[in-house]
């Protein structure tokens, strides 16, 4: 018999110490990685339930195992809330990750060797949008588009030219490091011109889309995917959506997830997704997302005022790229210097980056996590000044120590879990 008072601390102190250290790090460090966020205690509670014990291969009402009557309710709640949140007529909540959701779309709509047109990783796309190191570039004929190097915006003329030239079966819109507003309608216009599917990966902006402050791709795309963390602030996982009312495609998508790419769904994670979708339907979520954008804009503006280059000259969403080429600082060194002061970012390539992806010449900076813990525009601006103080001379250890003390004080004022 399993006793309810069994715990990690007593049984595995080494593991427990690592967990406690990570908890402390999250509280005492300022998180600026654009793809990270903090889930609510309700999401954590759902993810820690006995639902993790239940195998449920298949879909609600069509399971391969018995005893699924209760987890069917859980999954149906997640599906209905996802549809309501994004205005979809189809939702699959089973993908374990955004990349697995994307892989399912490829499997459902394409044959091996088909041509796809996606955003270059070097210009802000994602590995699964056709990178040569990903399944999307290895199993398919991937053609890549980029941004206008002058404006930092998507070059729609190039997208159309490449589409007409290569006749892709699927065009991928979406990004992992792009600070502008994407014209989903323009992408659909190009896709229709060449008879291609339009697949949108909105993983980074799903929360903004749900709140109605970033254009929704749902009226334009054949299929949409997203992660359920990032701006959506739910558990780590994936989601597939559509609003085209095409049952044939819906069946293909379901089959591509199970049995095509996965076995049993993670029912405890699906429960956590259901909680997160309900939270995203609350009015407070819209207020949060509005502040996310305000904070990101304030940070980008402050960097520019301090003499730093921001790709595209600012941001219209939750993230931006800091170009350090003119400062002769590598992204790797900048990442480390800020990390020493308890400010967590990630090094990132910038357009025309002369350095390798392991070194880079830029930083990707995002505001979802700091906003989640309560930072407003004032705190965001102050934080940016501290970051500039460090980047002005990354060898100045006195500045680093001073900023670290200020960061710790600010984190104490705005705990993640108060």
Curated annotation (Swiss-Prot):
(6S)-5,6,7,8-tetrahydrofolate binds at residues 121, 125-127, 356-358. Belongs to the SHMT family. NCBIfam families: PRK00011.1. Pathway: One-carbon metabolism; tetrahydrofolate interconversion; Amino-acid biosynthesis; glycine biosynthesis; glycine from L-serine: step 1/1. This is Serine hydroxymethyltransferase. It comes from Shewanella halifaxensis (strain HAW-EB4). The record marks 229 as: Plays an important role in substrate specificity. The modification N6-(pyridoxal phosphate)lysine is found at residue 230. Gene3D superfamilies: Aspartate Aminotransferase, domain 1 (3.90.1150.10), Type I PLP-dependent aspartate aminotransferase-like (Major domain) (3.40.640.10). It is found in: Cytoplasm. The gene is glyA. GO terms for molecular function: glycine hydroxymethyltransferase activity; pyridoxal phosphate binding. It catalyses: (6R)-5,10-methylene-5,6,7,8-tetrahydrofolate + glycine + H2O = (6S)-5,6,7,8-tetrahydrofolate + L-serine. The keyword Chloroplast does not apply. Its cofactor is pyridoxal 5'-phosphate. GO terms for biological process: glycine biosynthetic process from serine; tetrahydrofolate interconversion. Catalyzes the reversible interconversion of serine and glycine with tetrahydrofolate (THF) serving as the one-carbon carrier. This reaction serves as the major source of one-carbon groups required for the biosynthesis of purines, thymidylate, methionine, and other important biomolecules. Also exhibits THF-independent aldolase activity toward beta-hydroxyamino acids, producing glycine and aldehydes, via a retro-aldol mechanism.
């Amino acid at each position: 018999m399993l006793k309810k008072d069994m715990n990690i601390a007593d049984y595995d102190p080494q593991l427990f110490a690592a967990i406690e250290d990570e908890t402390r790090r999250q509280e005492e460090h300022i998180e600026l990685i654009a793809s990270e966020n903090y889930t609510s205690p309700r999401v954590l509670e759902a993810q820690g339930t006995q639902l993790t014990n239940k195998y449920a291969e298949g879909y609600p009402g069509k399971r391969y195992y018995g005893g699924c009557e209760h987890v069917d309710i859980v999954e149906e709640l997640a599906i209905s809330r996802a549809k309501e949140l994004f205005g979809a007529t189809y939702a699959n909540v089973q993908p374990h990750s955004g990349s697995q959701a994307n892989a399912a779309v490829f499997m459902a709509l394409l044959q091996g060797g088909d041509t796809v047109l996606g955003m270059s990783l070097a210009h802000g796309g994602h590995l699964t949008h056709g990178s040569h190191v990903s399944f999307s570039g290895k199993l398919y004929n991937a053609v890549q588009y980029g941004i206008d190097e002058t404006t930092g915006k998507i070059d729609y003329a190039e997208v159309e030219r490449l589409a007409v030239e290569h006749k892709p079966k699927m065009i991928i819109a979406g990004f992992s490091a792009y600070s502008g507003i994407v014209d989903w309608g323009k992408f659909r216009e190009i896709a229709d011109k060449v008879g291609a599917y339009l697949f949108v990966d909105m993983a980074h902006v799903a929360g903004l889309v749900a709140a109605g402050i970033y254009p929704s791709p749902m009226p334009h795309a054949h299929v949409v995917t997203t992660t359920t963390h990032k701006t959506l602030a739910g558990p780590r996982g994936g989601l597939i959506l559509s609003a085209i009312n095409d049952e044939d495609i819906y069946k293909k998508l379901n089959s591509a997830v199970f049995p095509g790419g996965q076995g049993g769904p993670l029912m405890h994670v699906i429960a956590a997704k259901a909680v997160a979708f309900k939270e995203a339907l609350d009015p407070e979520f819209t207020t949060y997302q509005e502040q996310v954008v305000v904070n990101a804009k304030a940070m980008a503006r402050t960097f520019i005022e301090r003499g730093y280059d921001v790709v595209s000259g600012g941001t219209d969403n939750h993230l931006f790229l800091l170009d350090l080429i003119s400062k002769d600082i590598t992204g790797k060194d900048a990442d480390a210097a800020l990390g020493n002061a308890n400010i967590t970012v990630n090094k990132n390539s910038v357009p025309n980056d002369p350095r390798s992806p392991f070194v880079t010449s830029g930083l990707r900076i995002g505001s979802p996590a700091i906003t989640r813990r309560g930072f407003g525009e004032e705190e965001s601006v102050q934080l940016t000044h501290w970051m500039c103080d460090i980047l002005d001379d990354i060898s100045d250890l006195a500045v680093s120590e001073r900023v670290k003390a200020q960061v710790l004080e600010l984190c104490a004022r705005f705990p993640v879990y108060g």
